[in-house]
């Protein structure tokens, strides 16, 4: 029988614990034990069940002060374990979905099945206080033996996601270390699970906000992150459909979406540009989105034709050549009080496409809310055509209407790695600490000829989001993320 208690005292190879029933017990000490820690143990771990256990109770009762101290430690740990004692969350998705609550030593504090298959999977298992890598490995092997992973299924995919506990009051540097450690933990889990025959593992690092939103919709955080990725591609999957889809089906659907985008023919001009400075009506590559719950509506699939001048000729500046707006000389980060940003980006388009995809997501890594009217983001590239011959479109902005996002092209003279950049600014929006915002957009030449992006400074030909320092972010004209090109 698995039991829980708080360590009151450590004596050599023994530890004194106070159980939730108010009983003091002496148990075998483990190497990782420390005073005040909540631990799980079995009856066979208890020393002299019929003797010393009750003697220790009698001794403890004689010291009221000691009892009060221990009770304080116990209730502090019991009631605050959901905040300071919890380091993060690891979710295993196959079709059974199970969330594991872990402490800073990567021990499992709690096991939370997230669907009926998950309840069946963990039934009868003793998983508390075990290393999370061992637990994940055990769950996946059990999924195979239970038939959740079919022997004849060529798509044996396991999704493992992780998120930190945002309730932990820590310095920014410690938070960044935690993020790096979480990534390393997911990599270690993946490396171990990859040893299981024919199992393919995909890992996702989620934000605490994404995890909370996932819980609202009754999804695991990993599945919800796949849903968000689908929304950015074309929005053809709904929340209700996600509930009924397996992880393998979802990932296969995402791959089909990506291939469809790559296979799309280059957009054709509907009319030719006129001489009076008027801009032609064109059909850019479709990037449709259905409504994300809690977010503003995005263009429907019926909107086949988009005018590049949708936002007031944003891509046609007033002057023929513009200098960068208040550039910063430093290529290092400038800390602006407790404000910080991080950009994650990858291109969904091939290097020789007719449009450059600058869609990204941006995190508030600081301790203060950020007014996005003070923020600028830059995407750097090389191109011989004039900035007057390019235009842009924003299809989705998670913190408001796409019309609240403005873009402008700038020449970047004297640089080897880039000669132009697109600057993205915001008319509205507030990004709270630990929150994330999404932008979907692209820019293109007015004649819709193809770009060659392989030598573009900001181009990232990856297949999923990653921290991307070749896009820069500024708060009040101070560089807070990324490295400017040389």
Swiss-Prot record:
Residues 75-486 are extracellular. PROSITE patterns: CBM3 (PS51172), RSGI_N (PS51849). The chain crosses the membrane at residues 54-74. Residues 336-486 form the CBM3 domain. One of its GO terms (biological process) is carbohydrate metabolic process. Residues 265-336 are annotated as: Disordered. The CBM3 domain binds to cellulose. Anti-sigma factor for SigI1. Negatively regulates SigI1 activity through direct interaction. Binding of the polysaccharide substrate to the extracellular C-terminal sensing domain of RsgI1 may induce a conformational change in its N-terminal cytoplasmic region, leading to the release and activation of SigI1. This is Anti-sigma-I factor RsgI1. It comes from Acetivibrio thermocellus (strain ATCC 27405 / DSM 1237 / JCM 9322 / NBRC 103400 / NCIMB 10682 / NRRL B-4536 / VPI 7372) (Clostridium thermocellum).
């Amino acid at each position: 029988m698995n039991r829980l208690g708080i360590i009151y005292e450590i004596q050599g190879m023994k530890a004194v614990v106070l159980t939730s029933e108010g009983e003091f017990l002496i148990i075998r000490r483990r190497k990782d034990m420390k005073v005040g820690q909540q631990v799980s143990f079995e009856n066979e771990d208890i020393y002299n069940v019929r003797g010393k256990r009750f003697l220790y109770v009698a001794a403890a009762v004689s010291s009221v002060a000691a009892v009060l101290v221990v009770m304080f430690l116990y209730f502090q740990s019991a009631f605050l374990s959901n905040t300071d004692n919890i380091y993060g969350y690891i979710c295993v998705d196959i079709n059974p979905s199970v969330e594991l609550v872990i402490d800073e030593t990567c021990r499992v504090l709690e096991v939370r099945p997230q669907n009926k298959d998950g309840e069946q999977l963990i039934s009868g298992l003793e998983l508390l206080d075990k290393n999370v890598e061992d637990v994940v490995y055990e769950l996946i092997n059990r999924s195979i033996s239970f038939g959740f992973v079919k022997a004849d299924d060529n798509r044996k995919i396991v999704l493992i996601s992780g998120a930190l506990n945002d309730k932990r009051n820590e310095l920014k540097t410690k938070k960044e270390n935690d993020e790096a450690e979480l990534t390393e933990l997911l990599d270690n889990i993946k490396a171990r699970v990859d040893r299981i025959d024919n199992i393919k593992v995909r890992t996702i690092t989620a934000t605490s906000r994404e995890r909370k939103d996932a819980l609202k919709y009754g999804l695991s955080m990993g599945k919800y992150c796949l849903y968000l990725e689908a929304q950015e591609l074309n929005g053809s999957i709904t929340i209700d459909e996600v509930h009924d889809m397996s992880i393998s089906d979802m990932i296969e659907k995402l791959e089909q979406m990506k291939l469809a985008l790559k296979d799309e023919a280059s957009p054709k001009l509907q009319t030719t540009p006129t001489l009076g400075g008027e801009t032609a009506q064109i059909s850019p590559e479709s990037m449709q989105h259905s409504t994300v719950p809690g977010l503003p509506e995005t263009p429907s699939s019926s909107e086949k034709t988009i005018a590049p001048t949708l936002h007031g000729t944003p891509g046609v500046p007033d002057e023929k050549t513009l200098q960068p707006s208040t550039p910063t000389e430093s290529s290092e980060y400038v800390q602006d009080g407790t404000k910080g940003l991080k950009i994650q980006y990858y291109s969904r388009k091939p290097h020789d496409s007719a449009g450059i995809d600058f869609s990204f997501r941006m995190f508030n890594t600081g301790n203060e809310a950020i007014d996005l009217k003070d923020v600028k983001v830059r995407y750097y590239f090389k191109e011989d055509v004039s900035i007057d011959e390019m235009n842009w479109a924003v299809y989705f902005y998670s913190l408001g209407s796409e019309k609240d996002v403005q873009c402008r092209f700038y020449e970047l003279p004297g640089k080897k790695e880039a000669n132009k950049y697109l600057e993205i600014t915001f008319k509205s929006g507030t990004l709270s600490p630990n929150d994330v915002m999404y932008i979907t957009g692209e820019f293109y030449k007015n004649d819709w000829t193809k770009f060659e992006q392989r030598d573009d400074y900001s181009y990232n030909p990856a297949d999923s989001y990653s921290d991307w320092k070749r896009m820069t972010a500024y708060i009040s004209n101070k560089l807070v993320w990324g490295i400017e090109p040389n």
